[in-house]
Amino acid sequence: MSQIDIRFFSHSLNRHTSFKMYIPDDKRNYGGVYDKQNMKTLFILHGYTQDGNNWIPEYISEKYNFAVVIPHGENSFWLDGLSTGHKYCTYVGEELIDYIRNTFGLAQTAEDTAIMGYSMGGFGALHTAFTYPDTFGKVCAMSSALIVHEIAGMKDGGDNGVANYAYYHECFGNPVSYTHLTLPTNRE
């Protein structure tokens, strides 16, 4: 098992950032089911106030013969920040995937590329997968923070116990613009 911590300059985020990657090079025998398949890539997006260290990427990587990539998304909801200029969706859906494919030769097709997340990361996984359907062939969202309708009615100075209006405004923009974040009910 190789664990790699990579730091590089991201044009989407306009700063240096880092991500972790796990590559199964000395696989244990888990029944031989995945031994002969090409290595696929799984992007895992962390939740609000987390940093990706709460997953078990080594197990996922070895058992399923996946390269696992865990980027840092701060508390961005994995969106392209309208006021900050930090484009987290673009970072994951374009820049990071290109970096992984070009540098490591992994997951050259959507069929071999999956994205998953928990809570805020689940929202980000759904949003990113639907924004880049030709990049991500599979998506898994666990306990996703699908809160755009809840916060759409929030007023300046409001708070929902997790964050305040100013934070949500920074992530999502004006409540009127939340409709562009609505996730489709079916995908063709």
Feature-to-residue mapping (PLM):
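Non-catalytic cap/lid and distal C-terminal segments of serine-dependent acyl enzymes
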Residues: M1-L181, R187
